[in-house]
């Protein structure tokens, strides 16, 4: 446990943030605010002002001095934050331009763009121009990178003037804004900073690409670009734009995309020149480049033959492991012909990624494939493609329907789908009756998100009338005024408003915004089906059977098939699935008739069917299906002069609760129908495994037929049902749900775009919390493929601009890295190596621990806005909660006081979804944290609770160490992180979901969950248990009765003496969720007792529950330790005498009882 690592990190981080400050401001002055120990508390005061350089030298002198490492750490921890005074407020944009010029000059002294790079860029530019000319018919005006003045001149209808010249509106131009949590010039300055500190490590190819990308950035920067400022105003007025002859439409996006390519230049392995090609092509065809540059991967994954190993798996979704024997390679002539045919027609022949693919078909090394795969991931980083909602939705729902279809196949499809739904719905109605006494109001409304209800209306909120689109407020309004809200069909027939979703490399998609009634009716049906699918109720057919518990190796069966190459793997992609003919009348009538038939099957009568707010769920479901079969979509483009569009639509509505699970059912029915018909003509086909996930599907089968015959026949069968499909077949590789499985290895693409976002960041979040989620995404990209260098570069880009908080116009506070990497409104809530939660302190000194606790906790501030309390006493809120409480009492057949209190608390929190309330909460929190910072002298009380790493250090101080045996193993689930690989080699890989040591059973929680219609968390139980006197029998009994437990269950539970055991488990429930190891690559680790015992061997006489908690705490600290230091060890703790043992046990139990666990934004359930 070397504190040297921690010291080096802390010093480097402080220095980095300081040197960035001196780079982007002219002559700033800085002063340390230092903490002084004052027995009970710490006292903060400000020291004298210096230049950043002087301060950097001061920190450097501490690190180099002869005092002990612990004393050095103490000196740096005492820096609470650094005040930065900026007198010269000259425009930062000018400073950035000077930096750009200096950087380009510096690179030009070392290299120039070679002919090879020049040819690559020119070739792809010409190809992009040709493609643009050939496809110009399908282009909208905003797909061209043209002058903004020209665009406005010929498309006046796309802009709306505002009262303020800088507050004009335009959906289309706003879609071209990259949406990043800093201004564009700040991004450029942080990229320049991060490259300048690595300047001497670049090779010649990297320098050439840097030269090209920085030149592109400079050209666009000098010409000017349009951006939305933090105060939601535009940077230019329309009058300026009409005159301006240099600002191009895509300038800002090209700058952000170039910055993204500079970051991926640090990925290993990658083709550097291809990154330059991406930008060259993107500059010509900004809306289409990502899609067309990435498309060859779909075919390549099916034909590339990797050097790998055979994988064996059982039929259980999550069991698979690689063996020693090499995988089997198999490629048919027809596949090669298809690939060559496609590639000869591919419009971007000069793409270096495609050239690498063509050279690497047979016997490809994993490294080579990784390089190609990283190039593929890089194409998505040009950012989100955003079209005008009207154009996009119109294109999305255009489908030719025909009566010339195979009637017999349609009947088969319809009966299959109906039969599946009938069985499920019959089971559903009975379960709701036996479980909730048929009243599902509480469950449905508790799960309702406070999203848009589609249209705006006036409602009373506290003392004012507000116009709002929020579902919750509409619901409260309906209930409190006793309005008739049951005629759902009529409501839908008036028209369905549309929202949109944007993703990189795909066209904008429409989302149906259905009213709250639809969500309330469909919730329990969807939940029932999902739960069943998750339990594997439909075999391993549904992707939902593959939950986080085993998300790592769910694809085991497919990994096995691709490594043995003995089955044909077929993946079909139905274009425009939602609007396809089989999803119109057949899909809706299958639902309607399934409900009618289910009613003849179950043993309950009509009055016992589930109801929500007095509406019969099944009746209303029929009404919704009938209304949606023939609906009108209303598509508005409010930031333009376009008229609202009404489009007739008959397909599936993405926006229903049942959309995804319903699609999965329809998909199973569709594939089954196709294969039933196929076996008539191809009797040798034997389907082995089928998997659907919404509209995605994969089938593996044994067949004696040729691969091209099977493909042609499949296409023909789909055609007879009027479904346009791409049927891709292969023996060795496939793509499913954004994962790529090839020759027994599973790759995930690192395609999370960091410098652009789908929507603008809310003004209510602090820059630190948005930066935290960006670091998290960058870590996921790094783990998946880009590697550790990329993550280091990204932290250097993301952290320095977000490390300071503005206090006044001229004063900023540069926070200590310790505060930044902890939890709270001004923190990232993530560690520098990408795990969710707080950065750990790896130091053994008690004094340092005290200082560290102060720095991490003094800004963890939570504020409850007054509006929440006020709204909870209004008649509107009561109307909703009273209905929900009576529903809980009907369902639980008891008063269930605690459950109803928890319900009230949870409903109160939903008021945060009301516009401005969340904003107020976050702003108050940030304001309070700022005030805490701006007091030059203040007293901070010491933290009395223990941090988990204190237990870790305690055990290590009493242990002996050995070097662990790391098993070299063949990866099935690929990652590109040295430290994760080390952890996998020591702890093993999660291979099965069967033999884990399960979390200890919390009987109390199980009993409550069995009866309660709303979700109850373990922390709720702990909170409410404090309100009862649990020392005597009556107190215990009352506590259990108020939880809704009665009769025999109450008697048995009281006799079992389990109450305190269960409350202890509830208190530490967070330990059983992996604390923010949300990256799937980390889920490949079996974080359980067995793994903990591979690292720690502890012989202390602890009660069993405490032993488990101790081991889990130690294991999580160990994961943090390895991810930070890269060192592994094995620790043995055997106390020498009984006295020492007793002392240690007492200390450990006290620490566990008073532990302070993180509350984290990012978390994943592990069990």
Curated annotation (Swiss-Prot):
Record bears the keyword Phosphoprotein: no
Alphabetically ordered keywords of this record: Nucleotide-binding, Nucleotidyltransferase, RNA-binding, RNA-directed RNA polymerase, Transferase, Viral RNA replication, Virion
GO molecular function, one term: RNA binding
Reactions that this protein is recorded to catalyse: RNA(n) + a ribonucleoside 5'-triphosphate = RNA(n+1) + diphosphate
E.C. number(s) listed in UniProt: 2.7.7.48
GO BP term, example: viral genome replication
Cellular compartments annotated: Virion
InterPro entries found in the cross-reference section: DNA/RNA_pol_sf, RNA-dir_pol_luteovirus, RNA-dir_pol_reovirus
One GO term describing the cellular component: virion component
SUPFAM superfamilies associated with the record: DNA/RNA polymerases
Stretches assigned to the RdRp catalytic domain: 553-735
PROSITE patterns: RDRP_DSRNA_REO
Subunit structure: Interacts with VP3 (Potential). Interacts with VP2 (Potential). Interacts with NSP5; this interaction is probably necessary for the formation of functional virus factories.
UniProt record similarity statement: Belongs to the reoviridae RNA-directed RNA polymerase family.
Function description: RNA-directed RNA polymerase that is involved in both transcription and genome replication. Together with VP3 capping enzyme, forms an enzyme complex positioned near the channels situated at each of the five-fold vertices of the core. Following infection, the outermost layer of the virus is lost, leaving a double-layered particle (DLP) made up of the core and VP6 shell. VP1 then catalyzes the transcription of fully conservative plus-strand genomic RNAs that are extruded through the DLP's channels into the cytoplasm where they function as mRNAs for translation of viral proteins.
Record-given protein name: RNA-directed RNA polymerase
Organism of provenance: Rotavirus X (strain RVX/Human/China/NADRV-J19/1997/GXP[X])
């Amino acid at each position: 446990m070397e504190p040297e690592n921690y010291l080096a990190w802390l010093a480097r981080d402080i220095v980095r943030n300081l040197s960035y400050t001196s780079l982007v401001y002219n002559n700033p002055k800085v002063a340390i605010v230092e903490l002084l120990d004052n027995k009970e508390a710490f006292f903060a005061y400000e020291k004298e002002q210096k230049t950043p350089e002087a301060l950097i030298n001061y920190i450097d002198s501490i690190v180099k001095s002869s005092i002990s490492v612990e004393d050095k750490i103490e000196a740096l921890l005492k820096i609470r934050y650094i005040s930065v005074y900026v007198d010269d407020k000259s425009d930062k944009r000018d400073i950035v331009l000077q930096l750009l010029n200096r950087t380009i000059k510096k690179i030009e002294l070392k290299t120039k763009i070679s002919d090879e790079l020049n040819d690559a860029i020119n070739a792809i530019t010409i190809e992009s121009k040709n493609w643009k000319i050939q496809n110009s018919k399908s282009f909208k005006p905003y797909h061209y990178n043209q002058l903004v003045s020209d665009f406005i001149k010929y498309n006046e209808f796309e802009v709306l003037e505002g009262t303020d010249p800088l507050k004009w509106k335009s959906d289309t131009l706003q879609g071209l804004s990259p949406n990043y949590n800093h201004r564009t010039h700040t991004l450029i300055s942080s990229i320049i900073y991060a490259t300048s500190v690595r300047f001497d490590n670049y090779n010649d190819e990297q320098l050439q690409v840097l030269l090209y990308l920085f030149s592109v950035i400079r050209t666009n920067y000098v010409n000017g670009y349009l951006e939305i400022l933090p105060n939601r105003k535009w940077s230019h007025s329309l009058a300026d734009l009409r005159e301006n002859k240099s600002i191009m439409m895509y300038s800002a996006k090209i700058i952000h995309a170039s910055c993204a390519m500079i970051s991926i230049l640090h990925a290993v392995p990658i083709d550097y020149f291809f990154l330059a090609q991406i930008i060259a092509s993107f500059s010509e065809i900004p809306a289409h480049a990502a899609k067309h540059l990435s498309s060859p991967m779909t075919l390549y994954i099916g034909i590339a033959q990797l050097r790998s190993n055979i994988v064996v798996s059982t039929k259980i979704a999550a069991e698979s492991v690689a063996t020693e024997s090499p995988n089997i390679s198999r490629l048919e002539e027809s596949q090669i012909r298809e690939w060559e045919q496609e590639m000869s027609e591919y419009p971007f022949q000069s793409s270096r990624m495609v050239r690498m693919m063509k050279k690497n078909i047979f016997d490809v090394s994993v490294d080579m494939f990784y390089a190609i795969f990283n190039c593929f991931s890089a194409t998505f980083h040009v950012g989100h493609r955003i079209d005008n909602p009207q154009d996009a939705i119109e294109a999305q729902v255009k489908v030719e329907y025909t009566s010339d279809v195979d009637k017999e196949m349609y009947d088969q499809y319809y009966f299959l789908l109906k039969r599946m739904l009938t069985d499920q719905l019959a089971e559903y109605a009975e379960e709701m009756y036996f479980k909730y006494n048929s009243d599902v109001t509480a469950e449905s409304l508790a799960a309702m998100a406070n999203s848009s209800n589609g249209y705006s209306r006036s409602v009373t909120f506290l003392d004012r009338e507000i116009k709002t689109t929020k579902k919750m407020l509409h619901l409260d309004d309906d209930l409190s005024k006793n309005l008739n809200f049951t005629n759902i069909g009529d409501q839908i027939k008036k028209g369905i408003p549309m929202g949109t979703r944007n993703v990189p490399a795909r066209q904008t998609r429409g989302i149906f915004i259905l009213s709250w009634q639809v969500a309330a009716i469909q919730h329990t049906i969807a939940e029932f089906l999902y739960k069943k699918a998750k339990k594997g109720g439909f075999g391993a057919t549904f992707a939902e059977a593959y939950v986080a518990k085993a998300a790592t190796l769910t694809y085991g069966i497919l990994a096995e098939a691709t490594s043995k190459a003995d089955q044909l793997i077929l993946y079909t992609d139905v274009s425009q699935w939602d609007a396809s003919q089989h999803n119109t009348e057949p899909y809706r009538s299958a639902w309607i008739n399934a409900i009618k038939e289910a009613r003849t099957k179950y043993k309950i009568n009509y009055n016992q069917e589930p109801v929500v707010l007095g509406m019969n769920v099944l009746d209303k479901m029929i009404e919704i299906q009938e209304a949606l079969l023939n609906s009108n979509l209303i598509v508005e483009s409010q930031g333009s002069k376009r008229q609202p569009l009404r489009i007739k639509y008959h397909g599936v509505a993405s926006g229903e609760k049942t959309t995804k699970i319903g699609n999965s059912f329809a998909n199973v029915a569709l594939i089954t129908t196709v294969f039933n018909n196929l076996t008539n003509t191809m009797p040798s086909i034997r389907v082995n495994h089928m998997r659907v996930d919404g509209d995605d599907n994969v089938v593996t089968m044994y067949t004696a037929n040729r691969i091209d015959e099977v493909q042609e026949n499949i296409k023909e069968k789909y055609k007879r049902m009027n479904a346009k499909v791409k049927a891709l077949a292969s023996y060795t590789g496939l793509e499913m749900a954004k994962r790529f499985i090839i020759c027994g290895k599973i790759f995930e693409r690192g395609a999370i775009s960091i410098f652009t976002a789908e929507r603008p960041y809310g003004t209510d979040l602090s820059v630190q919390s948005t930066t935290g989620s960006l670091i998290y995404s960058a870590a996921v990209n790094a783990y998946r493929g880009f590697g550790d260098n990329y993550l280091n570069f990204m932290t250097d880009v993301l952290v320095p601009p977000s490390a300071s908080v503005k206090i006044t116009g001229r004063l900023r506070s540069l926070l200590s890295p310790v505060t930044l990497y902890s939890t709270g409104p001004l923190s990232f809530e993530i560690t520098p190596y990408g795990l969710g939660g707080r950065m750990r302190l790896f130091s053994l000194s008690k004094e340092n621990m005290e200082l560290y606790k102060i720095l991490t906790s003094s800004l963890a501030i939570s504020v409850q806005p007054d509006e929440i309390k006020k709204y909870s006493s209004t008649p509107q809120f009561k109307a909703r909660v009273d209905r929900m409480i009576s529903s809980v009492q009907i369902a639980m057949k008891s008063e269930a006081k605690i459950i109803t209190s928890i319900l009230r608390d949870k409903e109160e929190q939903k008021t945060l979804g009301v516009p401005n309330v969340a904003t107020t909460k976050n702003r108050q929190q940030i304001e309070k944290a700022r005030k805490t910072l701006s007091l030059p002298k203040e007293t901070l009380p010491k933290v009395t609770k223990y941090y988990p790493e204190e237990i870790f250090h305690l055990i290590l101080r009493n242990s002996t160490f050995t070097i662990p045996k790391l098993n070299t193993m063949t990866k099935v689930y690929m990652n590109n992180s040295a430290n994760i690989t080390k952890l996998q080699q020591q702890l093993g890989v999660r291979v099965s979901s069967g033999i884990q040591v399960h979390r200890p059973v919390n009987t109390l929680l199980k009993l409550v969950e069995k009866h309660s219609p709303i979700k109850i968390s373990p922390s709720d139980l702990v909170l409410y248990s404090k309100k009862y006197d649990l020392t005597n029998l009556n107190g215990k009994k009352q506590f259990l009765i108020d939880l809704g437990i009665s009769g025999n269950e109450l008697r048995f539970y009281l006799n079992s003496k389990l109450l305190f055991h269960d409350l202890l488990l509830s208190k530490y429930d967070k330990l059983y969720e992996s604390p923010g190891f949300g990256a799937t690559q980390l889920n490949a680790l079996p974080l359980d007792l067995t793994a903990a015992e591979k690292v720690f061997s502890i012989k202390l006489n602890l009660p069993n529950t405490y032993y488990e908690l101790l081991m889990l705490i130690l294991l999580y600290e160990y994961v943090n330790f390895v991810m930070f230091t890269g060192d592994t060890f094995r620790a043995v703790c055997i106390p020498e005498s009984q006295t020492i043992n007793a002392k240690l046990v007492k200390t450990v139990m006290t620490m566990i009882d008073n532990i302070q666990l993180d509350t984290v934004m990012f978390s994943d359930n592990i069990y």
